[in-house]
């Protein structure tokens, strides 16, 4: 637990400070009133628009979820480790907002907890504190008997009107028996002094012990010895969670031993990858603008039965994240059946026109011969499986193709193969040159081929070096470095070593290591240009390397060539020039 020394008048005062809100969560299927605004209202109440920003509108979750700039001052690290792996319901007065489950591993949860442990941003100055209150805040929590606690409550406090204690009392606020293992003792005392200073409206948590003077300059006790009452309440609640606290501390110690490489730095990478700042305010980390797919045209893209099932049981469509390698995930909100149905109805009603969408596409039946021919084209000629997985073959850059038949409408499948950049302008998927009959054949194979989904687990952001370059990836600038990171690094690695996260899924094919001076220095710039423009197939290498000629201008490809040469710190061979000493 940390403290903060601040200037109040002529005095330096040490305060234990924290923001008010606790993590929010609700168990799957628990009945709650459905918002009158229907699926759109539920969509916003859950905070979906925080990541799916194309829908815009109000984001009430930003005011309901805790400001994590001060998480290290309020939450015990051992509690965070458990909660991040198994988020449970804490508060009940905020409608259907909840903390979703990101299905974090222990290694991931530890790193994120260690990052949050360090977040101790100090808020502004407090009003003047009475001397006895300063002493109480500085004093360690003392053991308090249940009898003393009950007498203090009976003196006029209304805690159990909203809160329960061991299941007895109100059902609006957090269970008081849990705060001793969840929160630092110093924060409990500071919060009880003045909930309103932590952003809690008085109609949610009214002042029980102190009120602000009319001029807002100092605290005034509501009844004699208010500071002693706070010490009694905080002491009892802190002690009540001692047994659970000890057990959680043991789990934290064991996790540290199991994952000695866990660090706050990796936790920050997770925090950014998962876009935690989209719902949780943070003083220095801002929400990502492009962390999830646009949904304004979902009714033209998805099939409703699949969508409804996916909302209740989200799986990894893009195992490395929405943008390949960013580590983002679709979290599990543990939706009830009626919630998933309402959201699916709302999303299917969103039919903003898609440029390039070919409608009323008719796909002929798929014979065994046609299926085998399509598979041959996918594996031996076209580069689709360099990014997508089908069965047990292919990369993990794009969505798994196994579930296309149940997930996507045929019109969309045909159109995305025909011209992906027209349909989804910011997609990195290139337009692969292929005859119309091949487009139709592959669309039939995917829609009618009877494929099953592949592995449905996410790759960890901790193991994705590209997750450390989110600011550059999200910028969508067109510099050579950003173009390389967005389009090439998944296979060739962020530093050009041929060790991108997708490389192991392409074996026996191996991406070129541009750090190999002996290899790259023997290739003219024209050769590298051709490989980028037309794909590795024109260089008699793996067809899994796509042709990027429709994605980049000629000048952008030339800049990429020079970016690749920077990895090996080598130039084109002298014989490839024009004799002038200048590069061609």
Task: Identify the role of each PLM range.
Residues 32-33, 50, 56-121, 166-242, ...:
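Extracytoplasmic electron-transfer domains, predominantly the class I c-type cytochrome c fold
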Residues 47, 158, 275, 383, ...:
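The −1 position to Zn-ligating cysteines in a subset of zinc-ribbon hairpins
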Residues 448-476, 489-515:
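Accessory recognition modules or surfaces
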């Amino acid at each position: 637990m940390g403290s903060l020394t601040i200037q109040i008048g002529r005095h330096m005062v040490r305060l234990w400070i924290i923001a008010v809100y606790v993590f929010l969560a609700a168990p799957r299927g628990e009945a709650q009133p459905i918002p009158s605004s229907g699926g759109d209202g539920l969509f916003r109440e859950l905070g979906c628009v925080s990541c799916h920003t194309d829908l815009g509108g109000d984001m009430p979750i930003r005011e309901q979820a805790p400001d994590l700039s001060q998480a290290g001052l309020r939450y015990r690290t051992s509690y965070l480790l458990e909660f991040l792996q198994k988020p449970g319901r804490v508060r009940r007065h905020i409608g259907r907002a909840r903390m979703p489950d990101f299905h974090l591993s222990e290694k991931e949860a530890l790193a994120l907890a260690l990052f949050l442990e360090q977040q101790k941003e100090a808020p502004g100055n407090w009003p003047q504190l009475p001397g006895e209150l300063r002493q109480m805040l500085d004093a360690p929590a003392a053991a308090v008997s249940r009898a003393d606690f009950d007498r203090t409550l009976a003196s006029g406090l209304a805690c159990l009107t909203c809160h329960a204690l061991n299941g007895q009392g109100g059902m609006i606020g957090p269970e008081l028996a849990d705060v001793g293992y969840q929160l630092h003792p110093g924060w409990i005392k500071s919060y009880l002094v003045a909930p309103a200073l932590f952003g809690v409206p008085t109609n949610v948590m009214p002042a029980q012990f102190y009120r602000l003077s009319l001029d807002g300059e100092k605290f005034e006790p509501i009844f004699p010895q208010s500071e002693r009452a706070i010490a009694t309440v905080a002491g009892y609640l802190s002690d009540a969670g001692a047994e659970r606290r000890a057990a959680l501390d043991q789990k934290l110690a064991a996790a540290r031993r199991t994952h000695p490489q866990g660090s706050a730095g990796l936790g920050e990478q997770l925090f950014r990858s998962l876009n935690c700042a989209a719902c949780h305010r943070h003083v220095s980390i801002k929400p990502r603008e492009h962390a999830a797919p646009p949904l304004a045209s979902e009714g033209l893209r998805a099939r409703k039965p699949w969508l409804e099932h996916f909302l209740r049981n989200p799986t990894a469509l893009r195992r490395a994240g929405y943008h390949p390698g960013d580590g983002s995930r679709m979290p599990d909100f543990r939706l009830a059946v009626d919630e998933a149905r309402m959201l699916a109805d709302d999303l299917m009603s969103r039919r903003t026109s898609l440029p390039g969408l070919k409608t009323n596409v008719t796909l002929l039946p798929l014979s065994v011969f046609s299926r085998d021919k399509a598979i041959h084209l996918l594996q031996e000629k076209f580069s689709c499986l360099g990014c997508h997985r089908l069965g047990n073959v292919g990369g993990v850059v794009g969505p798994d193709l196994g579930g296309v038949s149940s997930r996507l409408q045929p019109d969309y499948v045909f159109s995305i193969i025909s011209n992906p950049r027209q349909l989804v302008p910011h997609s990195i998927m290139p337009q692969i040159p292929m005859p119309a009959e091949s487009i139709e054949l592959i669309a039939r194979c995917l829609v009618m081929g009877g494929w099953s989904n592949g592995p449905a687990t996410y790759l960890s952001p901790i193991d994705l070096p590209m997750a450390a370059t989110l600011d550059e990836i999200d910028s969508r600038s067109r510099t050579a470095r950003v173009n390389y990171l967005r389009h090439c690094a998944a296979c060739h690695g962020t530093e050009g070593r041929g060790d991108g996260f997708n490389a192991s899924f392409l074996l026996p094919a191996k991406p070129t290591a541009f750090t190999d001076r002996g290899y790259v220095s023997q290739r003219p710039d024209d050769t590298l240009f051709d490989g980028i423009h037309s794909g590795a197939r024109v260089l008699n290498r793996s067809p899994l390397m796509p042709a990027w000629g429709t994605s980049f201008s000629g000048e952008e490809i030339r800049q990429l060539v020079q970016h690749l040469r920077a990895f090996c710190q080598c130039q084109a061979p002298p014989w490839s020039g024009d004799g002038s000493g200048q590069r061609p």
